[in-house]
């Protein structure tokens, strides 16, 4: 198989992977608010974090030990897609009578099987690139860019396309149909990807930890790896905050006569998509920054970028202050990529091959699992206090609190983490 061909196949995989997520991740909050679930938005995003505590690690172990990673990717996407379609169908058929319990249950099943696919897709890509004789640090970021392209295109699709009722998909259940269909396409496509062989069975008797792949947790014995994972969790608390509330926040300006006709207030998803455009460009900077500055400085840049991400949201509006929203979207690319992508590459470079899928799952557990769960729970408390339960809602106060949190995490990381040397083969 030619190097050009494998790159194209991995591009398609990444495109579909993130297109399925982009169809609803930033706009789901708007739909939930429209059906009366506004105060529970945090729970949906916390659930993403909760299932990421165990599902990525579990599926990573399965991929390392028993089932090739590309088949695990297919299985998970298939279940996720069917459950997401069921959630959309339930919302459509229930209309104004939609109940929280059934919809939340279907969403939970879908996200429980979707979240592991992010780390598994990375493992599939790294394995294929290494087989082709390529350096993942250099070759993966340009491929991963197309995942963000897919995310952007589905964001724009649900923003501009309207249903038979004349309402944009971003405000209705139609966004879940879009996501489910794309997941099923990837379910089929993943079966055509290069084989990722499981770890050969070791001779002799294995311990339970070795047999199940839990030995990835031995990384916590390394002080610097332990610090890295702890701060991955702390920074992971920031990841889903804007995904959960940015669309709802910007759309809320329509209730203010001064901004009711502002383009941004009426096209929140399109405005937010500038964040993903920035992400696309920033991915290309990662190889240079990782080689030049190392993981510590790259993650520090990400942490302080989150400060500006939240701060600009707090100060902006869709009218004369829309430029602050644009700046927030620009720094998002740095905030997200310099943490998520660089962290994943760091784990890949500094772990043994036999536990890499498990280690990627562990990274997901700390960031999108524990971090996102705690972060979205805390963010929900803040937003409910200052917005939904307040006599005079103050979104700005909530955003400034999030910015202050990111600043404190960045300062502590600068003090406690030392950039380790790259693992020698």
Annotated model-derived regions:
Residues 78-97, 304-319:
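C-terminal ends and interior cores of transmembrane alpha-helices
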Residues 160-181, 381-406:
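A membrane-interface helix-boundary motif in multi-pass transporters
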Residues 64-79, 291-303:
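Cytoplasmic membrane-interface "Motif A"-like loop-to-helix N-cap segments
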Residues 1-53, 224-260, 267-271, 340:
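Helix-loop boundary and gating motifs at the non-cytosolic
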Residues 108-146:
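Cytoplasmic helix-loop-helix junction between adjacent transmembrane helices
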Residues 1-4, 194-229, 255-260:
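Juxtamembrane intracellular "pre-TM" segments in multi-pass secondary transporters
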Residues 9, 58, 86-92, 182-195, ...:
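Multi-pass alpha-helical transporter architecture, strongest
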Residues 42-64, 270-286:
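Central cavity-lining transmembrane alpha-helices of secondary-active solute carriers
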């Amino acid at each position: 198989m030619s190097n050009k061909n494998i790159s194209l196949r991995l591009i398609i995989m990444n495109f579909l992977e993130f297109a399925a997520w982009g169809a609803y991740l930033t706009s789901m909050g708007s739909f939930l608010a429209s059906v009366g679930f506004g105060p529970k938005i945090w729970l949906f995003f916390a659930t993403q974090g909760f299932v990421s505590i165990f599902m990525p690690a579990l599926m990573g172990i399965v991929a390392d030990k028993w089932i090739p990673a590309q088949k695990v990717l297919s299985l998970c996407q298939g279940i996720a897609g069917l459950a997401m379609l069921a959630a959309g169908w339930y919302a459509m058929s229930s209309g104004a009578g939609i109940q929280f319990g059934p919809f939340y249950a279907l969403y939970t099943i879908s996200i429980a099987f979707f979240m592991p696919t992010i780390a598994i897709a990375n493992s599939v890509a790294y394995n294929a690139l290494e087989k082709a004789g390529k350096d993942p640090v250099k070759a993966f970021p340009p491929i991963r860019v197309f995942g963000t392209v897919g995310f952007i295109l589905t964001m724009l699709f649900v923003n501009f396309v309207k249903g038979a009722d004349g309402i944009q998909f971003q405000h209705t259940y139609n966004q879940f149909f879009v996501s489910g269909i794309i997941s099923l396409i990837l379910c089929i496509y993943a079966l055509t990807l290069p084989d990722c062989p499981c770890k050969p069975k070791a001779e002799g008797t294995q311990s339970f930890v070795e047999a199940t792949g839990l030995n990835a947790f031995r990384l916590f014995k390394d002080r610097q790896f332990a610090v890295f994972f702890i701060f991955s969790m702390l920074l992971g608390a920031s990841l889903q905050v804007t995904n959960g509330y940015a669309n709802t926040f910007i759309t809320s300006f329509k209730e203010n006569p001064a901004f009711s006709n502002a383009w941004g207030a009426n096209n929140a998803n399109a405005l937010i998509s500038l964040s993903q455009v920035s992400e696309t460009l920033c991915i290309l900077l990662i190889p240079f920054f990782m080689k030049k500055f190392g993981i510590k400085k790259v993650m520090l840049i990400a942490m302080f970028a989150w400060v500006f991400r939240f701060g600009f949201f707090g100060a902006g509006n869709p009218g004369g202050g829309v430029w602050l929203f644009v700046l927030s979207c620009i720094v998002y690319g740095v905030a997200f990529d310099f943490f998520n992508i660089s962290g994943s590459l760091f784990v890949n470079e500094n772990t043994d091959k036999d536990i890499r899928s498990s280690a990627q799952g562990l990274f997901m557990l700390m960031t999108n699992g524990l971090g996102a769960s705690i972060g979205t729970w805390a963010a929900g408390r803040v937003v409910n206090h200052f917005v939904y339960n307040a006599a005079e809602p103050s979104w700005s106060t909530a955003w400034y609190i999030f910015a202050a949190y990111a600043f404190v995490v960045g300062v502590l990381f600068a003090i406690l983490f030392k950039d380790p040397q790259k693992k020698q083969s």
